[in-house]
Amino acid sequence: MGVFFVGTSLTLRQCPLSLFVCHVFPYGSFHMGKRILSNFRGTKCPPEPPPQTLPDLLTFADQRLAIVYPVIQTFKKTITSDPLGVTKTWVGSDICNYKGFFCDSPPDNRTATAVASIDFNGFGLTAPTLDGFLDQLLDIAVFHANSNNFTGTVSPKISQLRYLYELDFSNNNFSGKFPTAVVNMVGLSFLDIRFNSFTGSIPAQVFTQTLDLLFVNNNNFMEKLPDNLGNTSVRYLTLANNKFMGPIPKSIGKAANTLVEVLFLNNQLSGCLPYEIGLLVEATVFDASLNQLTGPLPCSLGCLEKIEQLNFAGNQLYGAVPEVVCALGNLENLSLSDNYFTHVGPICRNLIKRRVLDVRKNCIQDLSSQRSVAECALFFAHPRICLNLLSYSIIPCKSSHWPFPFPWKFPPRSSSAQSKQPKAPSPSYSALIKHRL
């Protein structure tokens, strides 16, 4: 058991002269006493002061808890708003019962007890910084602080948190550059910094980390995406609602065996779609809507056997919608609206009837809800040319459903699509909402 003293040191009490006289000459028996007392005629001796008490003694279950106690109490004093009153529970030595704090045995000593996890999600706490708090919790493994009002920048000292594997700063008021300290955290697998005011670029080193989840959406990131984006081990990648520019890196195909969901939506991405997107055979969600992408849809997208949500709406794509894409058996939503496509074949038209495919506001003149002839003519008067056009006809997989013999027959829907069983919500799309995941 460890002990930690809390309190102030004892100080001598200053006694007034009248009190001195009352005690030294209690009966006024000496002449000097009489003369002194005459100066204090009518003055009563004050009551005896209460006895000094020793400081409170706090006893902790482990020395590691004693060490973080002053860290927590110092941080508590910086909090200017606590609408749920959670800090009222941050009293005494039982840190493991503080609201938002959770204890466990650290990896280096299974007999010890330490603060291993913090969950401030939804507390609405306001504080000027987390510096001096988070970076001093050396045994922390999980830190979640969604929907608070923490500000400032992220301290580079968090790189010393050797056990930290989940870090969530989402929906706060952090600013400055991307918190580069995280690139030195070898055990980090979950990084969520969405809904803040971070600016600048994403460091290339982030895409060499062993992350499972990376959410940076709804910030002010800009510049080009790193060329090594495809080197990532991330399964869920959300880059949406920023100001990223330039093309989608061709290296994305290197993430074929890991990437499950990726959101590029609502940025300023431009250029042509790389056919390497079709190599993402594990992908169930791919959304690059609301950008400035152009060119045809690569036929390689027909290799996305597991894809359920495929969204390229709100770009400048053109040409024919490949039938091989419409033939994908797990498609639940194929959004191609607000582009400049000119043709859809029988399989795609079948998806339109099923309300799986949306091609409104294109240049397919025999369908309703299309752009005007003049608007389409204006676009094609200044064609956007993609290099290596032959790559757009490549289907880099052996597909069980392609090619179909003439006449076209719509392929059977997969059992998962037929059963209509409720599915867990998409983690990436859920990240577009401010609440906790």
Regions found by a protein language model. Name each.
Residues 123, 148, 169-172, 193-196, ...:
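Consensus "Asn ladder" position of solenoid repeat domains
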